[in-house]
C-alpha cells in the first residue's frame, strides 16, 4: 500500500507526464455527453486516426440527439461510411431515439449502460468524462 506522500508524488508525476504527452483530440475539448458518446462509439474497434477524420463531419451533420434520432437511416449510414461496423451506427440511432423520448441524456453510468450498443467501457468513459463520475475506463 502506498503512503499518502507516495500517492501525491505518483499523481503529480502522472499529471506532468500527461501534460507533455497528451494528444489534442477534438472530443477531449468538450464535456457534452452527446459528443463524447459519439466519439466513444466511433472509437470502438476503430483507430483514433480514422475517427478524427469522421468525428467533426458527423457532428456537423448530426449536432444533437434529435437530429440523429430523426435522421433517415440512409443519411446516417452515408455519414458513417468508412468507419465500418454499421451496427454501431444503427445502435447509436436507436439509443438517440430513446434519449430523445426521455428528453435528456442519462447522467449515470447505469443509465448510459442501458442504451443500445453501450458496454462497460463506453458507459464508464461517458460517465467519467461528461459527468465527472468516478468510473474507471478499463479496456479489456
Language model feature labels by segment:
Residues 2-8, 12, 16-140:
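Catalytic cores of DNA base-excision repair glycosylases
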Amino acid at each position: 500500500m502506498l503512503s499518502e506522500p507516495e500517492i501525491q508524488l505518483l499523481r503529480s508525476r502522472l499529471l506532468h507526464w500527461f501534460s507533455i504527452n497528451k494528444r489534442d483530440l477534438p472530443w477531449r475539448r468538450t464535456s457534452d455527453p452527446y459528443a463524447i458518446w459519439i466519439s466513444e462509439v466511433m472509437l470502438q474497434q476503430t483507430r483514433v486516426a480514422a475517427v478524427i477524420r469522421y468525428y467533426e463531419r458527423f457532428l456537423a451533420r448530426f449536432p444533437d440527439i434529435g437530429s440523429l434520432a430523426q435522421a433517415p437511416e440512409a443519411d446516417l449510414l452515408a455519414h458513417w461510411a468508412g468507419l465500418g461496423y454499421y451496427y454501431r451506427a444503427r445502435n447509436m440511432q436507436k439509443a438517440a431515439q430513446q434519449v430523445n423520448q426521455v428528453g435528456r441524456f442519462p447522467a449515470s453510468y447505469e443509465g448510459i449502460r442501458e442504451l443500445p450498443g453501450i458496454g462497460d467501457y463506453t458507459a464508464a468513459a461517458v460517465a467519467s468524462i461528461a459527468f465527472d463520475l468516478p468510473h474507471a475506463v478499463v479496456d479489456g
